């Protein structure tokens, strides 16, 4: 049985007196800061609106949307019976439990409200947010690996399999967090970084966002074949996981966005 020793990385990055700073929190911070800076750089490369100042002002909205939506999404999608019995636990974000799909819904809501107040096109504004999103996904999945959570399915014959300390079975498993970091983070970021600079893509509002939806959805569906499903849910309809079921509408919505964008002439 093959396995790589899990790197003994303390989930706590450092402590400042009574304040404990975890790698997971730093991953969120890195994702927001670097994603924000990337949006500013993209916005400054093209005159007009949405402008860099618009993305500057949106940062707080994005943070609230991701955290609030991510937590509500986890409660609704992944552990609703538990939280119905323990409603106050839903407020205890520090106990863990965030959903990407919930965070996405939260950000979409924030974009719609922000753009309505500013008189901006949600599609054009969302395109640059979509181009930056893989940065946060990359760091978030690395933090999942450091925490030894959301690990993969048993893989006794895979030479790079890892035995995770939090696994009750203590068997070699796919490091699915790293697979997701690579697909949803690195690969998707590079793809979007190339496309968002192409006039035929950048000039069609909604095109970049649509490609992000398709790219993330497909990446997540693939990665879920290697990831252990949540214990309280297991496998659902036709052997699919919750992550896969939530990603299918993402892909379909992305295809629709791209189709609609292709019908519009590029604003070059």
From Swiss-Prot:
InterPro entries for this protein: Lgt (IPR001640)
Catalytic EC class: transferase
GO MF term list: phosphatidylglycerol-prolipoprotein diacylglyceryl transferase activity
Coiled-coil annotated spans: none
Keyword set, alphabetical order: Cell inner membrane, Cell membrane, Membrane, Transferase, Transmembrane, Transmembrane helix
Domain of life: Bacteria
Similarity-based family: Belongs to the Lgt family.
UniProt cross-references to HAMAP family, sorted A to Z: Lgt (MF_01147)
Purpose: Catalyzes the transfer of the diacylglyceryl group from phosphatidylglycerol to the sulfhydryl group of the N-terminal cysteine of a prolipoprotein, the first step in the formation of mature lipoproteins.
Record's protein name: Phosphatidylglycerol--prolipoprotein diacylglyceryl transferase
Species of provenance: Azospirillum brasilense
